[in-house]
């Protein structure tokens, strides 16, 4: 059943990736997907400069956000934990928007570093305020901090109205206009981070038994928590720097896949990565074809999917 699930998700991902290249305001014929990859062909510019970069970003950012959600849920043993619910997304967004508004000439390659610093600062403050891994308190504290970071972001935009357009589009969580400059920065980092997450599989499995038992079985709990959390924040921040704050993938996908595959992280992490990539590719495709030529922010569609799921989880855990 698990192998069949992986095959199904992989085939669905491949099919949606082809549809993403094919569909849009300017449809690309299926034959052109095989032939028009060299300069001078009719659909070369649409494929190479517009659709392929955003498809690659959707694949890797979706996978990274889902894996970050798995890591955070495993670290705190909390099914409500995710980068966006805990406020990491919004803290990273605040740092990135501050850079976009206050230092507009800043190179794109610096954004992931600033987003990472903002995400880590938000996570440290959350740990200081919550002082517990109790699911409801963590979730509520994270939501409160998210509102705080969002308010500060709004203040920054109101104080710099002349520079607000790019920041406003970026804040909705969008793949629109993403070119190879974003791909060259974000994807090498994702290629480094995603395999590293597999090194935590055994320790996260043992952490699920409780800190005391995990320590008895040879896990350095503080060491594992620190490095796994650092990796999760790094993946989230890189995704935020590339595409803006895309909500709920880190919450919905890990929880859904855990209910299907079980809690073994060696299975859960790869399946969640594939499903996160699939969800973001589908959301980006729908964002382009629902109301052409207008394009919806992809973050709006992921929020429409994820918000009811989060409410259902809260109600079920009462």
UniProtKB/Swiss-Prot annotation:
Changing residue 54 to C: Retains 19% of wild-type citrate-mediated Fe(3+) transport. Changing residue 288 to C: Retains 65% of wild-type citrate-mediated Fe(3+) transport. GO terms for biological process: intracellular iron ion homeostasis; iron import into cell; siderophore-dependent iron import into cell. Disulfide bonds: none annotated. Belongs to the binding-protein-dependent transport system permease family. FecCD subfamily. GO terms for cellular component: ATP-binding cassette (ABC) transporter complex, substrate-binding subunit-containing; membrane; plasma membrane. Induction: Induced 1.3-fold by hydroxyurea. It holds the Pfam family FecCD. It is found in: Cell inner membrane. The keyword Cytoplasm does not apply. This is Fe(3+) dicitrate transport system permease protein FecD. The complex is composed of two ATP-binding proteins (FecE), two transmembrane proteins (FecC and FecD) and a solute-binding protein (FecB). Interacts with FecB. Residues 24-55, 127-137, 201-225, 291-294 are periplasmic. Signal peptide: none annotated. One of its GO terms (molecular function) is transmembrane transporter activity. It is a multi-pass membrane protein. Part of the ABC transporter complex FecBCDE involved in citrate-dependent Fe(3+) uptake. Probably responsible for the translocation of the substrate across the membrane. The chain crosses the membrane at residues 3-23, 56-76, 106-126, 138-158, 180-200, 226-246, 270-290, 295-315. InterPro entries: ABC_BtuC-like (IPR037294), ABC_transptr_permease_BtuC (IPR000522). Keywords: Cell inner membrane, Cell membrane, Ion transport, Iron, Iron transport, Membrane, Transmembrane, Transmembrane helix, Transport. The keyword Iron applies. Residues 1-2, 77-105, 159-179, 247-269, 316-318 are cytoplasmic.
């Amino acid at each position: 059943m698990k192998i069949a699930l992986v095959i199904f998700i992989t085939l669905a991902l491949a099919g949606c990736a082809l549809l993403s290249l094919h569909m849009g305001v300017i449809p690309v014929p299926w034959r052109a997907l095989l032939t028009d990859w060299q300069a001078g062909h009719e659909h070369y510019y649409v494929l190479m400069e517009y659709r392929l970069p955003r498809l690659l970003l959707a694949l890797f950012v979706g996978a990274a956000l889902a894996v970050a959600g798995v890591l955070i849920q495993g670290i705190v043993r909390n099914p409500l934990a995710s980068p966006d619910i805990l406020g990491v997304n919004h803290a990273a967004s605040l740092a990135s928007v501050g850079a976009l508004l206050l230092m507009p000439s800043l190179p794109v390659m610096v954004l992931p570093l600033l987003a990472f610093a903002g995400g880590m600062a938000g996570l440290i403050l959350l740990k200081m305020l919550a002082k517990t891994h109790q699911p409801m308190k963590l979730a509520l504290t994270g939501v409160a901090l998210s509102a705080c970071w969002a308010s500060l972001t709004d203040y920054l935009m109101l104080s710099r109205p002349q520079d607000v357009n790019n920041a406003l589009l970026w804040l909705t969580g969008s793949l629109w206009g993403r070119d190879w400059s974003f791909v060259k920065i974000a994807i090498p980092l994702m290629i480094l981070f995603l395999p590293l997450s597999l090194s935590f599989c055994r320790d996260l499995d043992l952490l699920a038994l409780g800190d005391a038992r995990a320590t008895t079985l040879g896990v350095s709990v503080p060491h594992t928590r620190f490095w796994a959390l650092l990796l999760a924040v790094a993946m989230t921040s890189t995704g935020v720097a590339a595409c803006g704050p895309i909500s709920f993938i880190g919450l919905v996908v890990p929880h859904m896949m855990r209910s299907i595959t079980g809690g073994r992280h060696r299975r859960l992490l790869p399946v969640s990565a594939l499903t996160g990539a699939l969800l973001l590719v589908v959301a980006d495709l729908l964002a382009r074809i629902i109301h052409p030529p207008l394009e919806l922010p992809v973050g709006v569609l992921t929020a429409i999917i994820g918000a009811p799921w989060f409410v259902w989880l809260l109600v079920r855990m009462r």
